Amino acid sequence: MAGTSAESEAGQDGMEPVKPLEAELLVVTGMSGAGRSTAADALEDHGWYVVENLPPQMLGTLAELVSHAPQSIPRLAVVIDVRSKGLFADIRAALGALAASGVTFRVLFLDASDNVLVRRFEQGRRPHPLQGGGRILDGIAAERELLQELRDSSDVVLDTSGYNVHGLATAITELFSETGPVALRLNVMSFGFKYGLPVDSNYVADVRFIPNPHWVPQLRPHTGLDKDVSDYVLEAEGVKNFVDRYVMALEPVLDGYRRENKHYATIAVGCTGGKHRSVAVAVELSKKLAQYPRVTVTTTHRDLGRE
């Protein structure tokens, strides 16, 4: 947000400067129907502390409270919209007070074309907050006039016309996630069929086609985490080919999850008891999947030790 004119406005209005804020501060505003709620949800999902529908005059008070909070709040997002009615006119003065106090912040302005905004309001069967007794377009026009100066001075203007909910959430994540685009988190879980399927599994691989180390006396006491069992399992005919093909089959799934803004999935690998074959294959599968960009993998063994 530009500082010079805002700072002079703050001085003229006599607003008290706030204590310097250590948290990263993002002010989210924009046109009604442009996706503020979706943006707020996406920010909250990725570690931001989100305050919605805050009157602009309370920005300084909130910053002061956060600066004295006993528990650190590293990233704070504040959503402001025209439902604050008359108080919205004070937003530049409030932002000016923050700038004058040395608080670093960014302003995200969400926008969309008139046609898209009208369609969204009609689909939601709700009136525009500024239309009064007129048309939705009348409310949009009034809001554009009210927000034009703020839009022009915002740090980021994001046109959401071409986004659905998932696409907008992904765009927000890529803009404001601490580490850029969020990773897809995969949990590769070994299990034993005799104990039942994992209820939270998205995909299940059945590896009972592999010769069972249980019937090899020297391997029976060991598990798939031990090298002798792992070598026995992975060197069996067709196993490495199976793992490679399974990973290839998951590639379009991983891409689709990213497009749909899905961040978690569980891939279950099962054998009879969850001790030998599934454990070894789950470890190998995890190594392969971890090589993909923007993927983090954890490996768990649900039934290891149950026997």
Curated annotation (Swiss-Prot):
GTP binds at D81, V82, R83, S84. Keywords: ATP-binding, GTP-binding, Nucleotide-binding. One of its GO terms (molecular function) is GTP binding. SUPFAM superfamilies: P-loop containing nucleoside triphosphate hydrolases. Pfam families: PapZ_C, RapZ-like_N. ATP binds at G30, M31, S32, G33, A34, G35, R36, S37. HAMAP family: RapZ_like. PANTHER family: RNASE ADAPTER PROTEIN RAPZ. Belongs to the RapZ-like family. Displays ATPase and GTPase activities. NCBIfam families: PRK05416.1. This is Nucleotide-binding protein Achl_1824.
